[in-house]
Amino acid sequence: MLKVIYRERIFIDTYQCIEYEKEFKAWSCWQSGGLYYFKVDRFNHKVLAVEDTISIKEV
């Protein structure tokens, strides 16, 4: 099981945004073309850009 911490941005307008750090657990991950793909359960995947991913740790 992996613990993933990532940065989520909510844009208020063209020049301002609010950044949050969020986390989730995933079964596995792989990287392809600047994106991380995380298997979060039997049927679903979550896709994050490499630059938005803060840490991936084995739990």
Question: What do the predicted segments below correspond to?
Answer:
Residues 10-52:
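Acidic, low-complexity, intrinsically disordered interaction modules
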Residues 1-2, 59:
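Generic structural signal for short, solvent-exposed loop/turn connectors between secondary structure elements
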Residues 52-59:
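Boundary regions of SH3-family modules and the immediately adjacent low-complexity/disordered segments
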Residues 2-10:
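A short beta-strand micro-motif
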Residues 6, 40-42, 58:
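Residue-level recognition of conserved beta-strand positions in structured domain cores
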